[in-house]
A protein has these predicted regions:
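Structured beta-strand/loop patches that form or line metal/cofactor-binding pockets in enzymes
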Residues: 1-50, 331-339, 391-392
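Conserved, mostly hydrophobic/aromatic
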Residues: 3, 35, 104, 117, ...
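Metal- or metallocofactor-binding catalytic centers and their adjacent structured scaffolds
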Residues: 32, 36-115, 391
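Glycine-rich, aromatic-flanked loop segments that form ligand/cofactor-binding clefts
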Residues: 99, 105-141
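Metal-dependent enolase-superfamily TIM-barrel catalytic cores that perform enediolate-based chemistry
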Residues: 130-238, 243
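Shared catalytic-loop signature of beta/alpha-barrel
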Residues: 214, 220, 231-250, 254-351, ...
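Extended hydrophobic packing segments that form well-structured cores
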Residues: 360-392
Length: 392
């Protein structure tokens, strides 16, 4: 199957705010090959990612992603990996390339699965898919009372695990954060799994992060996610060396396999979180999942946007029965909610399951998302390199 066309669609809510909510805009990718159409989603700035696909070549190691993709054959998983390797070489100085390629790569897996009549996870070598325990992924409220109500709501909906992140954490004093953690625990109940995400707020300040450990332990948190910058491996290792009962989590900032492995080997995290929309797609995420198994680290998806992205993020570890928890975007913006025609919902036991339909198993509702489409055009020296294509 030859890659005939790659289309990018920049979607956005009418108003974008400064809250740490990545579902306010989206970049969908539609790929046509061999009579099949596949969809993917980049977890990145839409306009910058489109530019990385079409930009003029700067030199031999800084080429647009487009040059390595269009016209290529995609008849096997090995072909997808081969294209990814070419991009790593030809676009090594184009730092946005991995994010752009991520969405294209997902779409290629979607196409390959549809062509073979199998879900992506089977193409990755899994015989069966294991159910995952979804944790409702939420932002902290502006105050503990607001946080309490948010967590109570998801508990009432049947979720036994919840993650609270960003918001005011790390911006005030230790007591302020302790009150937020306690509110999360109160809302979830004694038996729920509480996860805390600091959103990299402490940079590489180990002492500031460590000052929160007693409060996290008191709240019974399972992990402390991204206390530091995504590449501050020494800071992660220093905090892990204090042997807290709470394990560290990180890895969503990895935009290649090497960064993810470094987080495991040098950052000493107990949970490695990979975003297929950033790392280069499903293939590199599967490599990290296998590496995590070998290193005794728990693999977890990172997804805070649509259920198209959720399906893609589940594929790399679908068959890993011992890696049971899954990030579940609980309160995304309307844009993200409307991308998928059929959302991935918990079953009667509270588990979610990766789709078993061919490809990613998620149909994109082009009519529903048309109202979010942002018309964009990139013109260089009088030549149009990109113009928003038609959705249907």
């Amino acid at each position: 199957m030859k890659i005939d066309a790659v289309d990018f669609f920049y979607l956005a809510m009418p108003q974008i705010t400064t809250e740490g909510d990545g579902s306010q805009d989206a970049l969908l990718v539609r790929v046509a090959a061999g009579g099949q159409v596949g969809w993917g989603e980049c977890e990145a700035s839409p306009l910058v990612s489109i530019a990385a696909y079409v930009c003029p070549m700067s030199h031999g190691a800084c080429r647009p992603v487009k040059d390595s993709v269009e016209g290529q054959n995609v008849d096997s998983p090995a072909e997808i990996a081969r294209i990814g390797a070419v991009i790593q070489w030809d676009s090594m100085d184009l730092l946005q390339a991995a994010h752009t390629w991520s969405g294209v790569e997902m779409a290629l897996w979607d196409i390959l699965g549809k062509a073979r009549g199998e879900p992506v996870w089977k193409l990755l070598g899994y015989k069966k898919a294991a159910g995952k325990v979804p944790y409702a992924s939420l932002l902290f409220g502006d105050n503990p009372d607001e946080t309490l109500e948010r967590v109570k709501t998801v508990r009432q909906k049947g979720f036994t695990a919840a993650k609270l992140g960003w918001g005011p954490i790390g911006r005030g004093n230790v007591k302020d954060d302790a009150d937020q953690f306690a509110a999360g625990r109160e809302g979830l109940g004694k038996d729920g799994m509480l996860l805390i995400d600091a959103g990299q707020i402490f940079g590489e300040n180990v002492e500031s992060a460590a000052a929160r450990l007693p409060a996290l332990q008191s709240a019974g948190a399972t992990w402390f996610e991204e206390p530091f910058h995504g590449s501050a491996y020494e800071a992660y290792a220093a905090l892990a060396a204090r042997k807290p009962s709470i394990r560290l989590a990180g890895g969503e900032a990895a935009h290649n396999v090497f960064m993810a492995k470094h987080m495991i080997d040098y950052g000493k995290v107990g949970f490695i979180q990979i975003d297929c929309g950033r790392i280069g797609g499903i293939s590199p995420a599967k490599i990290v999942a296998d590496y995590a198994v070998a290193k005794g680290v728990t693999y977890v998806n990172h997804t805070f946007t649509s259920h198209l992205a959720l399906s893609a993020s589940l594929q790399p570890y679908a068959g890993l029965a011992d890696h049971r928890i899954c990030e579940y975007p609980m309160a995304p913006k309307a844009l993200a909610r409307e991308i998928a025609r059929t959302p991935i919902l918990p079953d009667r036991e509270g588990l979610i399951h990766v789709p078993d339909a061919p490809g990613l198993g998620v149909a994109v509702d082009t009519k529903a998302i048309a109202k979010y489409l942002v018309e964009a055009e990139i013109v260089v020296a009088g030549r149009t390199l990109y113009k928003t294509p038609k959705l249907a």
